[in-house]
Amino acid sequence: MSGIPLEANYLVIGGGAMGMAFTDMLMTGTESTVIMVDRHHQPGGHWNDAYPFVRLHQPSSFYGVNSKKLGSDTIDATGWNKGLYELATNGEVCAYFDQVMQQQFLPSGRVQYFPMCEYRGDQHFGSLVSDAEYDVVATKIVDATYMHVTVPSMRPPPYEVAEGATCVPLNALPRLAGQWDRYVVVGAGKTGMDACLFLLKNGVAPDQIGWVMPRHAWLFDRADIQGGQMFARTLGRWGGETFDAIAESESVDEFFANLSGRGLLLRLDESVQPTMWRCATVTQAELVQLRKINTIIRSGHVQRIEANSIVLDQGTAPTSPTTLHIDCTADGLEKRPATPVFAGRDITLQSLRMCQQVFSAAFIGHIESAYDGEALKNELCMPVPHPDTPLDYLRTVVGNLLNAARWAQDAELQAWLRHSRLDFLNAPDAGGEVDEELAQRLAVAAVAKLQRWLAEVDA
């Protein structure tokens, strides 16, 4: 059955942060028309499904779309983020993207937005709430869903929950907290940390909390990811000190020891070597709080939660019917294989810089708007896949440096980067000069050493 015919220059599949950031560049850099299709009722993607107390894990100042500021560049005066730039709440992020859609995209007359709709392939999509079906004629098809973002509320837990046991996604925590003798957080990533911090912040004693931690993670210090008046520290930590750590190391293990010694990477337990790295950020104050939790369950992944026992890969742990188990095991951003960003009519949005998906989507939008030729556009948009293990840290640093070296050869692109609010490594108002020649020499040496280490590991 044929659907209602539609036509536009671009069909953008997904109205999350990456789809919005890409489309924003088309709106500001071209006269193109766009059809945007999304399963949610409003823009923002997974932010619509996220737990109510979630905040950005990076400053608001370099999140969102390039054309509209998020937040007010306020430095938090209280709380565990004290002294650092503000982190937007879930509600603020959803409202922000809705404003971009309602106040910028739709009034332009160049965007048609179809919420509560599902793309079915072959330039066809349909409504999730009615019988409406649509056929699209579009010059380009943009996949803004390739990163497969998943949060706990989007699916049941990946383990069995027996009768007599209670397990909920952490979305339910504000509603259910206070009704239980104990809490067990399942999942060692940033979502699990947020659940623990929520409980601690609201007065739950550390000895009432258990934490299932199949893998320990390396963490970024959020103080090292700041713009504005703190940008000099950010640049020094991500540039000079990281180069120094590489230069002073003769092996992968020594490199991570040097990163840890400099505080460039943090960990929950100094006695445990992390086997996970997913870009999670934490403040020193948050780390102090998390370390108060002593019941850490390190017996692998949960297989089944019973009324009085948690069955794991390598053993069991006691629980009870009066314990609330909090599922924090969703993958978040998957580690996806790199694929060409530009392939004929298809554009696949991916990260081009370590853990900076929204900046990357805007960058791809700029390249699509300002450059011609598929080969050149792909040369400028080499994916840096989202990480999962510590070795991926090496791979992403190499990807970052190779991309930065290529971008540095293009004066017009450098000018765009300097004025992009989403590029936290090019704070436009920070001032200061960078010795580009020295930085290039250090980067070349760093890439050579990191690639040698990776080759040795893969051999």
Where is each model-derived feature located?
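Extreme N-terminal leader/targeting segments of oxidoreductases
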Residues: 1-10, 28-32, 147-175, 448, ...
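N-terminal Rossmann-like FAD-binding beta1-loop-alpha1 element of flavoenzymes
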Residues: 5-36, 183-202
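Short hydrophobic core segments
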Residues: 11-13, 134-149, 184-186, 320-331
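Glycine-rich active-site loop/strand segments that organize a redox cofactor
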Residues: 39-96, 170, 212-269
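Feature captures the FAD/FMN-dependent oxidoreductase FAD-binding
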Residues: 77-151, 269-272, 279, 286-312, ...
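Glycine-rich dinucleotide-binding loop and its adjacent helix/turn
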Residues: 83, 89, 96, 145-203, ...
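Glycine-enriched catalytic-core subsegment of oxygenase/oxidase enzymes
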Residues: 197, 296-299, 303-436
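Dinucleotide-binding/catalytic capping subdomain of oxidoreductase cores
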Residues: 200-306, 350-362
